[in-house]
Amino acid sequence: MPFSNSHNTQKLRFPAEDEFPDLSSHNNHMAKVLTPELYAELRAKCTPSGFTLDDAIQTGVDNPGHPYIMTVGAVAGDEESYDVFKDLFDPIIEDRHGGYQPSDEHKTDLNPDNLQGGDDLDPNYVLSSRVRTGRSIRGFCLPPHCSRGERRAIEKLAVEALSSLDGDLSGRYYALKSMTEAEQQQLIDDHFLFDKPVSPLLLASGMARDWPDARGIWHNDNKTFLVWINEEDHLRVISMQKGGNMKEVFTRFCTGLTQIETLFKSKNYEFMWNPHLGYILTCPSNLGTGLRAGVHIKLPHLGKHEKFSEVLKRLRLQKRGTGGVDTAAVGGVFDVSNADRLGFSEVELVQMVVDGVKLLIEMEQRLEQGQPIDDLMPAQK
């Protein structure tokens, strides 16, 4: 398990080749990048909080691959991980984020007025719309590496900040450990709450230690603005509602997020961010905006079409099953969202989803009438 530094010194008694993990059957980004030479070069290093290379890669060693998506296979334990282990993380980031270079700069745009349209996605097809991101609080270790005290301090800070929100963002906090089993399951089934920590990716990285201590969910009174505390990231901020008004969802998201950041700053805390990687999060796949704008969309015909995957790829979108990353589609309903996180601004990513979903609906309508969709095939974005 992560968080043990004396153990790292112990390991160094063995030569690097004796400690190098067997990655022969692995299909993840870490396994593509990590060579015995790189392992030998980085294994003795650690961040100021004691996070090591072996801590970073453990989840990818224990989880060779995923049937639906290519996993990353490495996590950060603190803000410095991306710097201390940059020789591992930079190629992973480049591979994962479409050639993003170590010299590239990330751009942020949380002004919902810059989004064109998006308030009229057809509710006959779009069942719900959702935008989420993560935020990490500077000065604390990230979930794979944080201590109980750090986790509890993050919970306390977050709850204090969130309780200052007012208007339609005002709400309350529900600590996981004080929820009944039934309450918890209801929130999970309604897609409001993260699952119990059964995901091997969470378990192997050390993120599920001490569960459910200092974990919880804050949401406003009508459950359209939610904040998860201490799951994979310090904070996961989510705006969601039924139907196809992505503009409204994104506007609430930007307003709430900006207010939360201001509240943290008033307590002398800021979010981890730098000009190259944007917002720093636990998993390299979420760097940059950390943003996933998604819709649950009914595509019974297009979902079975041989060109469906190609269409999504060209639109820079990805599909997941109805229940999230580890699930299959039920009743022709897919969770469709932006594939990118880094190198595009928040507005650009939501725009891609809005424009792409409109085209998917047009294609579905064509197929309903038994007509071809070849002339609607998009160019690569």
UniProtKB/Swiss-Prot annotation:
In the kidney localized primarily in the outer medulla in the thick ascending limb and distal convoluted tubule. Its main location: cytoplasm. The modification 3'-nitrotyrosine is found at Y269. It comes from the Eukaryota. There is a cross-link at K45, K107, K381 (Glycyl lysine isopeptide (Lys-Gly) (interchain with G-Cter in ubiquitin)). It catalyses: creatine + ATP = N-phosphocreatine + ADP + H(+). Its EC number is 2.7.3.2. PROSITE patterns: PHOSPHAGEN_KINASE, PHOSPHAGEN_KINASE_C, PHOSPHAGEN_KINASE_N. Residues 96-122 are annotated as: Disordered. GO terms for cellular component: cytosol; dendrite; extracellular space; mitochondrion; neuronal cell body; plasma membrane. Residues 11-98 form the Phosphagen kinase N-terminal domain. Coiled coil: none annotated. ATP binds at residues 128-132, 191, 236, 292, 320-325, 335. Residues 130-138 are annotated as: Internal MTS-like signal. The modification Phosphothreonine is found at T35, T322. Dimer of identical or non-identical chains, which can be either B (brain type) or M (muscle type). With MM being the major form in skeletal muscle and myocardium, MB existing in myocardium, and BB existing in many tissues, especially brain. Interacts with SLC12A6 (via C-terminus); the interaction may be required for SLC12A6 potassium-chloride cotransport activity. The internal MTS-like signal (iMTS-L) mediates targeting to mitochondria thermogenic fat cells. PANTHER family: ARGININE OR CREATINE KINASE, CREATINE KINASE B-TYPE. Belongs to the ATP:guanido phosphotransferase family. This is Creatine kinase B-type. It comes from Rattus norvegicus.
